[in-house]
Amino acid sequence: CPFDAMGSTMATYGGQNVGAGKLDRLGKGLKSCVLLGVGYSVIAFLIAVFFGGPLAQLFVDGGEAEIIANVCAFLLWNTAFYIPLALVNIVRFLIQGMGFPKFAILAGVFEMIARSLAGFGLVPIIGFTGVCLGSPIAWIMADAFLIPAYFHVSKVLQKRMVPQTDVPQAV
């Protein structure tokens, strides 16, 4: 998946730039990768809109109208939220590469909570649409944690890079 590749790229990019002390490059790389993710997301959504049915029929007999309709609905709901998915992968792995792996793990916990809430809360009320919304809700919940976390770890790293001038020197 392109989002996995973007995430792996950002982990390496984050680690290299933090190691080199070039924190100013992190935001530029993040912006560039997010733009790539948005571009891919739009293309994937358009493919799902215009070719979801034929794609489903590659795997399901054309006579299975209800299954094909469910596949199309699932594709549309998920691809409509690929931008938040792109952000999850890009920001999570960037933070991990910057040296803060616990934040990446916590984002996964938020995703798990969101999927559980969708499964137990939405599916009984709205049925299959609740299933379709499980992952998008998880991605949004992870982003709600990861985006502020990125700014937090950036500030932490900025403070680490600033030389301590108010510390008395030993003579």
Question: PLM features: residue spans?
Answer:
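Membrane-interface helix-loop junctions in multi-pass transport and translocation proteins
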Residues: 53-54, 112-144, 148
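Small-residue-rich hydrophobic transmembrane alpha-helices
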Residues: 1-52, 85-99, 103-107
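Hydrophobic alpha-helical segments of multi-pass membrane transport proteins
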Residues: 77-91, 141-153
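Membrane-interfacial segments
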Residues: 54-63, 126, 130, 153-162
